Every structure is written in C-alpha cells, then in structure tokens.
C-alpha cells in the first residue's frame, strides 16, 4: 500500500535560495525523494547537488494539503 510523504527542502545555488514543501504518494521514502529530485531538477533546471532535503515525514491522508493529491485519495 502506498504511503504519503511530505518533503521539505531548499534549492541552493540560484540567486537566492528557494524553499519548498511537496507531498508525494510513494511505496518507499527513497522513491519519494527520487521523485522530488527528478521533478524539481527538470522544472527549475538545477542539478541534484543543488537540491537540499531538510525533512522527510510520513503523513496520514487527513494531513494532506495538496489539492491534487487529495482528489486522488
């Protein structure tokens, strides 16, 4: 059964650091982290070394804030 992960981090190396919080549905924590590296790297044209993960936490379906993820659940 997939779990829901909230990932907090920042992108360094640009003009000013960008802070982000994303929620993903994944089987393992590693899969969610891989997904964030892939998505942010492609959208913001940054390398994985510039993406710093601050916190990864597993959350319940009630705690989801992303409206798209809420619609899927």
From Swiss-Prot:
- What name does the UniProt record give this protein? Large ribosomal subunit protein eL20
Which keywords label this protein? Ribonucleoprotein, Ribosomal protein, RNA-binding, rRNA-binding
Which proteins does it associate with, and in what oligomeric form? Part of the 50S ribosomal subunit. Binds 23S rRNA.
Per its record, what are the GO molecular function terms? large ribosomal subunit rRNA binding; structural constituent of ribosome
Q: Does the keyword RNA-binding apply?
A: yes
Protein family per UniProt: Belongs to the eukaryotic ribosomal protein eL20 family.
Cellular component annotations (GO), alphabetically ordered: ribonucleoprotein complex; ribosome
What S-S linkages are listed for this chain?
A: none
Q: Which GO terms describe its biological process?
A: translation
Kindly give the Pfam families that the UniProt entry links to this protein. Answer: Ribosomal_L18A (PF01775)
Q: What is the lineage of its organism?
A: Archaea, Methanobacteriati, Methanobacteriota, Methanomada group, Methanococci
């Amino acid at each position: 059964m997939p779990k829901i992960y909230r990932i907090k981090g920042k992108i360094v190396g640009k003009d000013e650091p960008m802070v982000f919080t994303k929620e993903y549905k994944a089987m393992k924590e590693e899969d969610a982290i891989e997904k964030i590296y892939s998505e942010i790297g492609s959208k913001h044209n940054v390398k994985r070394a510039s993406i710093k993960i601050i916190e990864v936490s597993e959350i319940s379906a009630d705690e989801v804030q992303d409206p798209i993820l809420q619609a899927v659940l």
